[in-house]
UniProtKB/Swiss-Prot annotation:
Native source species: Plasmodium falciparum (isolate 3D7)
The organism's taxonomic lineage, starting at the top: Eukaryota, Sar, Alveolata, Apicomplexa, Aconoidasida
Intrachain S-S bonds: none
Stated role: Participates in iron-sulfur cluster formation (ISC) pathway for iron-sulfur (Fe-S) cluster biogenesis. Plays a role of a major scaffold protein for [Fe-S] assembly; assembles [4Fe-4S] clusters directly upon interaction with the catalytic component IscS-Isd11 as part of the scaffold complex. Can transfer [4Fe-4S] clusters to target apo-proteins.
InterPro entries: ISCU, NIF_FeS_clus_asmbl_NifU_N
Protein name: Iron-sulfur cluster assembly protein IscU
Coiled coil (UniProt feature): none
Length: 162
């Protein structure tokens, strides 16, 4: 069973454990599944206190909405942008997935607020991954966030043109 548990394992490094039975009263310093991943402080911060969680009314003309996902890992991100005069005034997200997907989504919403549409389209997954110090096996989460930005802008532009 997956769960969010902060623990101090392996030489005192702080990590996010993916399994509830990793820790128990008898053996708090051993992960039975050895599937603990070390995350940066930025990932832990955005995972534990995600910014801009929620949604807007997708029927509003100035709201661009995207839903992107990766079937192989089960991550799904819904991103919505509130755009006025080609400037992203606000952003909201909802995510179902791992800590890296949540952190990537949360950071992406902070990164794009106040940017023009053209500036937001220049954001690459590397901007997100490098800030969060994502490990190589979690880079796909930053790719999802980049795709979500692009698709939300595309949706907004389609709505404005109709």
């Amino acid at each position: 069973m997956k769960s969010k548990i902060l623990c101090n394992l392996f030489k005192g490094k702080s990590c996010i454990c993916l399994y509830t039975n990793c820790l128990n009263e008898n053996n708090v310093n051993k992960c039975y599944y050895n599937l603990v991943r070390n995350y940066s402080d930025h990932v832990k911060d955005h995972f534990n206190k995600p910014r801009n969680v929620g949604s807007f009314d997708k029927n509003e003309k100035n709201i661009g909405t995207s839903i992107v996902g990766k079937a192989s890992c089960g991550d799904v991100i819904k991103l919505q942008l509130k755009i006025e005069n080609d400037v992203i005034k606000d952003a909201r997200f909802m995510a179902f997935g791992c800590g890296s997907a949540i952190a990537s989504s949360s950071y992406a919403t902070e990164l794009i607020k106040g940017k023009t549409i053209d500036e937001a389209l220049k954001i690459k997954n590397n901007d997100i991954a490098s800030h969060l110090s994502l490990p190589p096996v979690k880079i796909h989460c930053s790719l999802l966030a980049e795709d979500a930005i692009k698709h939300a802008i595309k949706n907004y532009r389609e709505k404005v043109l109709t």
